[in-house]
């Protein structure tokens, strides 16, 4: 589904990814953890073409991202970040259906039904559809962000510390929601976090990164019972 082949990336004199190789099979929930600046976000953004390798290749569904129409690619991949990225002047319903609308789906009734269905999928009631982002709590906004990512019928979901700003109770609820959604929709999820407990709870596998390289890749149990080195 997603493959990195000998990827190198630098910003100025700083090497961010170094001969990076990784394969993420379809339907896997991969959590990624590491210190700030280790290359996590750069790696994630290469999947949807927001960053390009200096050398090597990134493939999504066997297609080289560098040779793919990026608008089409990005509309097919859900992307959720910590600050939700919702448009404040749009209702929740309009936010959720933004990608389908700009992709040509103009039927208002159909889009409304899609928004309501996705609200229910992420655990929010129908009456939220006509509210604006500023009328929602942080946890509710994050759920709407996930619903919007799902609206394009994406099979891949990229998440960059999506729950980092939430309180612990809301964070745990969202984690459980994501586990349920992933099982229900069989999505491929790449999820960056600074929270080791979150990484262990959510990931089928956990990728530990350090200085642009893979320090260890394995199941939560493998990471806990057989750490590769003192850093891990």
Residue positions per predicted region:
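Helix-to-loop junction immediately C-terminal to a conserved catalytic motif
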Residues: 48
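ABC ATPase NBD coupling module
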Residues: 64-78, 102, 108-109, 226-227
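Conserved ABC ATPase "signature" region
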Residues: 109-127, 180
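Conserved ABC ATPase signature
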Residues: 132-136, 140
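A short, proline-enriched helix->beta-strand linker immediately N-terminal to the Walker B motif
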Residues: 151-155
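Conserved ABC ATPase "signature" C-loop
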Residues: 211-212
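ABC ATPase "signature
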Residues: 217-218, 226
